[in-house]
């Protein structure tokens, strides 16, 4: 490959990156800040009533679940008490036992039966909105009397129809949806921190 071809390839890649950055910015701008503030207040009300936050998802969304919980049980933007939050994605023994003995489709709903109480706040994360185990988890959470939030992308999928609240990211690209989910999670944590 000649020098001119290398420069053309570098220019092409930089244009791809520029488009990617703009798509990410557009996705983050699709987040309704008033809705984020309401969700943060609702979670604070759950905490103040003795409830907890429970979060789950698959793959990158599982990582987002754990990140959300870490910001609350640990530290986000200021010193405050640890807040009661748990991710259903961290207990490998439970995940594999439930998947083996029952089905991966019920890996979250089964754990919710054990840990969720009426009034808890349950968040299911799925970039497609159609992960069967996330749908079933949110359905079970509602049956148990929990408040429910779907974090998704695209058109929202099934979880947006199941949950009481939904954050739907305006993108078709999984990685951009995931990045916007983390931005939304950080915004929610910022609202929560403002109450403590």
From Swiss-Prot:
<feature type="binding site">
    <location>
        <begin position="126"/>
        <end position="128"/>
    </location>
    <ligand>
        <name>substrate</name>
    </ligand>
</feature>
<feature type="binding site">
    <location>
        <position position="178"/>
    </location>
    <ligand>
        <name>substrate</name>
    </ligand>
</feature>
<dbReference type="InterPro" id="IPR050099">
    <property type="entry name" value="SIS_GmhA/DiaA_subfam"/>
</dbReference>
<dbReference type="GO" id="GO:0005737">
    <property type="term" value="C:cytoplasm"/>
</dbReference>
<dbReference type="InterPro" id="IPR035461">
    <property type="entry name" value="GmhA/DiaA"/>
</dbReference>
<keyword id="KW-0862">Zinc</keyword>
<dbReference type="GO" id="GO:0005975">
    <property type="term" value="P:carbohydrate metabolic process"/>
</dbReference>
<dbReference type="GO" id="GO:0097367">
    <property type="term" value="F:carbohydrate derivative binding"/>
</dbReference>
<dbReference type="Pfam" id="PF13580">
    <property type="entry name" value="SIS_2"/>
</dbReference>
<protein>
    <recommendedName>
        <fullName>Probable phosphoheptose isomerase</fullName>
        <ecNumber>5.3.1.28</ecNumber>
    </recommendedName>
</protein>
<keyword id="KW-0119">Carbohydrate metabolism</keyword>
<feature type="binding site">
    <location>
        <position position="186"/>
    </location>
    <ligand>
        <name>Zn(2+)</name>
    </ligand>
</feature>
<feature type="binding site">
    <location>
        <position position="178"/>
    </location>
    <ligand>
        <name>Zn(2+)</name>
    </ligand>
</feature>
<feature type="binding site">
    <location>
        <position position="71"/>
    </location>
    <ligand>
        <name>Zn(2+)</name>
    </ligand>
</feature>
<feature type="binding site">
    <location>
        <position position="131"/>
    </location>
    <ligand>
        <name>substrate</name>
    </ligand>
</feature>
<comment type="function">
    <text>Catalyzes the isomerization of sedoheptulose 7-phosphate in D-glycero-D-manno-heptose 7-phosphate.</text>
</comment>
<comment type="pathway">
    <text>Carbohydrate biosynthesis; D-glycero-D-manno-heptose 7-phosphate biosynthesis; D-glycero-alpha-D-manno-heptose 7-phosphate and D-glycero-beta-D-manno-heptose 7-phosphate from sedoheptulose 7-phosphate: step 1/1.</text>
</comment>
<comment type="similarity">
    <text>Belongs to the SIS family. GmhA subfamily.</text>
</comment>
<dbReference type="GO" id="GO:2001061">
    <property type="term" value="P:D-glycero-D-manno-heptose 7-phosphate biosynthetic process"/>
</dbReference>
<feature type="binding site">
    <location>
        <begin position="100"/>
        <end position="101"/>
    </location>
    <ligand>
        <name>substrate</name>
    </ligand>
</feature>
<feature type="binding site">
    <location>
        <begin position="58"/>
        <end position="60"/>
    </location>
    <ligand>
        <name>substrate</name>
    </ligand>
</feature>
<feature type="binding site">
    <location>
        <position position="71"/>
    </location>
    <ligand>
        <name>substrate</name>
    </ligand>
</feature>
<feature type="binding site">
    <location>
        <position position="67"/>
    </location>
    <ligand>
        <name>Zn(2+)</name>
    </ligand>
</feature>
<dbReference type="GO" id="GO:0008968">
    <property type="term" value="F:D-sedoheptulose 7-phosphate isomerase activity"/>
</dbReference>
<dbReference type="InterPro" id="IPR001347">
    <property type="entry name" value="SIS_dom"/>
</dbReference>
<dbReference type="InterPro" id="IPR004515">
    <property type="entry name" value="Phosphoheptose_Isoase"/>
</dbReference>
<dbReference type="InterPro" id="IPR046348">
    <property type="entry name" value="SIS_dom_sf"/>
</dbReference>
<dbReference type="GO" id="GO:0008270">
    <property type="term" value="F:zinc ion binding"/>
</dbReference>
<keyword id="KW-0413">Isomerase</keyword>
<feature type="domain" description="SIS">
    <location>
        <begin position="43"/>
        <end position="196"/>
    </location>
</feature>
<keyword id="KW-0479">Metal-binding</keyword>
<keyword id="KW-0963">Cytoplasm</keyword>
